[in-house]
Amino acid sequence: MIVGVGEAMVEFAPAGAGLYGRAFAGDALNTLWYLARLGAPARFLTRVGADALSDGFVAFLSESGIDAGAVSRDPESTMGLYLIELDGAERRFLYWRDSSAARRLADDPERLDSGLAGATLVHVTGITLAIIGVEGRRNLVEALGRARARGARVSFDPNLRSRLWPDEAVAREAQAAIYAVTDIALPSFDDEATLWGDATPQATAARLAALGVDEIVVKNGAGAALVHGGGEVRAREVEARDTTGAGDSFNAGYLAARLRGHTGLDACGLAHRLAGEVVRWPGALAPAATVEAMA
């Protein structure tokens, strides 16, 4: 069982003629959704409201083949939302998430342990770390340590969103703590250059390897992904319509292939192909049938 831990948000993406389509998304959720489409058993650990919108999200998980048993409900909050504005294939996000119930997804250590029970892989992101606060981060890191002791592996995508952190020092401290319980690191080079001052993807990989992370893939946008100790894998050129969800789908393609026993280099090949397909569609989630055909 793969467990994704993070925030689910309501997404409004341009649908043409000045209209917006509604969907559910979030970086860890996107990765988990793509993993489920690729045939992996998946569970989402999050916290949402007790309103009709949150009911719709839980139904969405079930319809997507994702176990919703680790979704807790908060009667005093609801889901955050964001709106995508496009400039060509690039996008700008407007967020409304201050009252998001997911900010309290890690408040209860027992609930974390229950949600992570039976996991073979747990996927976490830097956005999750940013929104759950100091106590939540401590609870989550400790819960991940217990999950690893039970045999789970942990994958982490730093996915830096500077505006969610009080300052860079807090973000670096939080990342350092979670890397102590991380087996697979999936950073993006531009984030690492911003937060850590890394000059090259190789410098990022070397820094994380020195922290004891076993498996490292450094993404570099449309450029080559670096597999630490293995080499680089280049992406094929595609005409991008919307790059939302590209990194999340890359993570899913890579993890799905590794779980099937493929090498890191081969797994990057699938990851690039999946991400290249995803950017051809609007919003974070490509059509399910398109993704399932790649399984």
What residue ranges belong to the model's regions?
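Conserved phosphate/ATP/ADP-binding segment of small-molecule kinases
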Residues: 150, 160-230
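Active-site metal-binding loops of divalent metal-dependent hydrolases
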Residues: 8, 158, 249
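Helix C-cap/helix->beta junction micro-motif
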Residues: 38-40, 147-151, 181
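Conserved N-terminal subdomain of the carbohydrate kinase-like
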Residues: 12, 41-127, 295
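Hydrophobic anchor at the start of a short beta-strand
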Residues: 41-42, 68, 154, 216, ...
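Glycine-rich phosphate/adenosyl-contacting loop at the front of the ribokinase-like
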Residues: 1-66, 239-240
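Conserved phosphate-binding/catalytic region of the ribokinase-like
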Residues: 145-146, 197, 201-295
